[in-house]
Amino acid sequence: MSRIRHHRFIQSCLVISTLLITLTGCQVESEPKTKLEQIRERGILRVSTLNNQLSYYIGSNGPTGLDYDLAKAFAEKLEVKLEITPAYTYSGLFPALERNEVDIIAANMTITPERLQKFRPGPVYYYVSQQVVYKKGSWRPRNIKNLTQLDENLTIVKDSSFEGTLIKLKEKYPNLDWNTAADTDVSELLKKVATGEIHYTLADSVELSLTQRIHPDLAVAFEVTEDQPVAWFLQQTEDDSLQALLIEFFGELKESGKLALLEEKYFGHVESFDYVDTRAFIRALESKLPKWEPLFKKYAGDFDWRFLAALSYQESHWNPLAKSPTGVRGMMMLTLPTAQSVGVKNRLNPEQSIRGGAEYLRRIVKRVPDSITEHEKIWFALASYNIGFGHMMDARRLTQRLGGDPDSWTDVKDNLPLLRQQRYYRYLRYGFARGDEAQNYVENIRRYYQSIIGYEQEQANKLKQEELTVEDLQVIDVPLSSAEASVSQAIETKK
């Protein structure tokens, strides 16, 4: 009897153990995965962004833009592929996040009380202010009270942060009125202000500065807000795994200086604005560039052809017969020795000049020290194109002596004007140089380049708006291994 009881006891223990293991297994399987685990298991980071000249656009070497570069770096940290969903208006961004169709919204959007109620912000990565925009030559309101006295209403993007700002202001200014426009974006409203279709709108300071490169008639009436933080947005849940990694990611970028480099790359040149020069450039862009565009594309090689075009405009204003008292000539304003070194026989021949200028710049870029970040090498090369490689290296050495970073264009460009001052150049290997001119030279080219990008983006968006409805989104898969994906990457349109 005791043997039977002992046997039954063992059987009972086995049954109970099996049940416990089964139940434990069920609990493990039923425990929900964190957002971070889901992304890693999926192997894809899904990011929604705006198709504009700051967040994301297709350049000559594939996708680019501040938010794109950041999203790609974050996907690499996660060791997953990046799936970009670009939208043309704000209206589709947050609904897609609510439906869990994307993991992150990365679209240079400000943190507002309204957004905080529904969504979780990531770390702040720069600041913008909201500005009232009007067209030069029209009446300029100086304050909110002036806006309440207008016959013409302010027009803003529906459900934007600007609408939230105006709703608050209306509590103090009951007569403040405005119109809202759905299925559009800020850049489209800015264009309408420039063409006179509407009188006033609100825009953030960075977007306005970039758009002024295409529409120089736009001007700031006054600022409505102080600086506001810009961040990515996530779903509002108790799961903070994705946000925690984002905090770590942006912290590393700031500490390493990489975030500052990206900001310099995309809007380090926007502070200075020359109305007359920009208007002249836009006219030349429309009337002259189409004739020379094929040659810039033909000889650009690894360069973005628009960059080469911007350099040529700075040199000659796209005049193939340009000459200067110093002896430089042609579209790329080559000296005789430089022309001979790159095989140019006739500097006034536009094709030879463009080919020679591109080759000369290519050689300079190769000489720039490898300690300098790849995307910043071009600015050092341009400074060399203007004042000579030796003077550029002098500026780097001087920057280091003064406690700056000789590999940072931001630091070096600030010290270029010192090459004019005897107390500095007397100790430099190559002596005096017009460093201030080189500084302006590089920044001008960056602005012209931005204008061409913005102009092309505007034309492309016109076509896209005709082809796609507002709800249509393009999903673009960016392979982890492709730092510069080609334009011909696979694009799948979701209906």
Curated annotation (Swiss-Prot):
UniProt name for this protein: Membrane-bound lytic murein transglycosylase F
Alphabetically ordered keywords of this record: Cell outer membrane, Cell wall biogenesis/degradation, Lyase, Membrane, Signal
Active site (catalytic residues): E315
Ranges for region Non-LT domain: 31-270
GO CC, alphabetical: cell outer membrane
Sequence similarity: In the N-terminal section; belongs to the bacterial solute-binding protein 3 family.
Source organism of this protein record: Aliivibrio fischeri (strain ATCC 700601 / ES114) (Vibrio fischeri)
Secretion signal span: 1-30
Function (record text): Murein-degrading enzyme that degrades murein glycan strands and insoluble, high-molecular weight murein sacculi, with the concomitant formation of a 1,6-anhydromuramoyl product. Lytic transglycosylases (LTs) play an integral role in the metabolism of the peptidoglycan (PG) sacculus. Their lytic action creates space within the PG sacculus to allow for its expansion as well as for the insertion of various structures such as secretion systems and flagella.
Enzyme Commission number, as recorded: 4.2.2.n1
GO biological process: cell wall macromolecule catabolic process; cell wall organization; peptidoglycan catabolic process
Membrane-related topology note: Peripheral membrane protein
Domain text: The N-terminal domain does not have lytic activity and probably modulates enzymatic activity. The C-terminal domain is the catalytic active domain.
Top enzyme class: lyase
Highest rank taxon of the organism: Bacteria
Subcellular localization(s) per the UniProt record: Cell outer membrane
GO MF annotation list: peptidoglycan lytic transglycosylase activity
Main localization, broad class: membrane
Matches recorded under InterPro entries: Lysozyme-like_dom_sf, MltF, Solute-binding_3/MltF_N, Transglyc_AS, Transglycosylase_SLT_dom_1
Pfam families the UniProt entry points to: SBP_bac_3, SLT
Location of region: LT domain: 272-495
Reaction equations catalysed: Exolytic cleavage of the (1->4)-beta-glycosidic linkage between N-acetylmuramic acid (MurNAc) and N-acetylglucosamine (GlcNAc) residues in peptidoglycan, from either the reducing or the non-reducing ends of the peptidoglycan chains, with concomitant formation of a 1,6-anhydrobond in the MurNAc residue
PANTHER family: MEMBRANE-BOUND LYTIC MUREIN TRANSGLYCOSYLASE F
